[in-house]
């Protein structure tokens, strides 16, 4: 009974329960500690696995780089055509034609005639690249069928080449004779139609912005060129009814700086405005000296290209003006050359082109020169340059008209416009000896400064006066352009011209002053 009493003792029972709770708590703490340890180990394992994978990837990449470095370099060639059985390809590589195999991974549709291909170690085509973008330039003489062309280089050597894929594209126009092609002579392919850079370099095709209002003192010359150039374009039906052929060309000649180039530009601008919605006119401004080329026949070829371009632009009925500035530089009298005498071939080329313009009523040639006696007479005969217009040096009335173009109420003035212009003209045309000419018969003629007045000179005088007015305005002395500024500018212009006359060749003075008469034997600066 005593043992039974002790086993059911409450104190012992409580002690056992406390022990169990403590043990459970300890075990729970151990479990949580083990869980944390497991999580840490799992995270470390994941990180180690990632590092191992990264190391393997880097090792694999390094192995690949080593393999790539150990491979031989790739060769490139030009694809020519597929073999007849369609399993191999004909290529040009290393200066020889070869038949090679193609990689099974290569898409046959990427192989176009003329495309570059990359070759493997066994000369197997691995991939198709782009078309060649560098090479020689040649001029297309004529097309042979649709896929071949006859070309000529600068030396005149001709050969036949095939057209590469881009030139065979049916969505584009085929090259035309006269086009410049990019070619690979060894492969025998033409890859690209190069734009006519020489035309853009030598010519300005858009209509200028110069109008007749901008030209002063040349009313008679403007009327003459309007009658010669604009009437046939504006009233072609009247010319047809009277069976009158429009002139093929106009020659503007006279002393330098008197407005010959301005007149030609104003004609193109006036035509462009008058035809209105019907289109625009084209002004092909040929820079004469830049046509000269050391290669035989190159100057003639460029002249042909210019006229071909003019015919192309005139095909839709729009007026086209071909303007040759400094015409004497390239169309001198045949037989006058002292070196290669290139005029013997250049002049006939222009004559042939002028005669070829006969059926193109909307193309006209305008030439400008201050040495008209040097131009070959065959160019100046009727039927070629039909109209000859002399652009004289301005007289008092013309000079006043030119001054009025530059001195207007739109700029700050210290006096009325008319007063300033009258003062400038009076001072400019005041007799002041410049040079003394002794003619071949012994007579003596004294030329004054006003004998050398030109439109360009008047424009320069006004610019000088405006600069002086600006300086005085900044210094607070005067406001606006004054008569003193103009007088001082005229004196400066005359003073700076004193050291410029050339007295070594007296014959030149007959041309400089723009007069016809006896030869000059001696020149003396006064």
Swiss-Prot record:
InterPro entries: AAA+_ATPase, AAA_ATPase_domain, ATPase_AAA_core, ATPase_AAA_CS, NA-bd_OB-fold, P-loop_NTPase, Prot_ATP_ID_OB_2nd, Prot_ATP_ID_OB_N. Residues 1-20 are annotated as: Disordered. GO terms for biological process: modification-dependent protein catabolic process; proteasomal protein catabolic process. Pfam families: AAA (PF00004), Prot_ATP_ID_OB_C (PF16450), Prot_ATP_ID_OB_N (PF17758). GO terms for cellular component: proteasome complex. ATP binds at residues 257-262. PROSITE patterns: AAA. Residues 1-18 have a biased composition (Polar residues). NCBIfam families: pup_AAA. Belongs to the AAA ATPase family. This is AAA ATPase forming ring-shaped complexes. It comes from Corynebacterium efficiens (strain DSM 44549 / YS-314 / AJ 12310 / JCM 11189 / NBRC 100395). The lineage of its organism: Bacteria, Bacillati, Actinomycetota, Actinomycetes, Mycobacteriales.
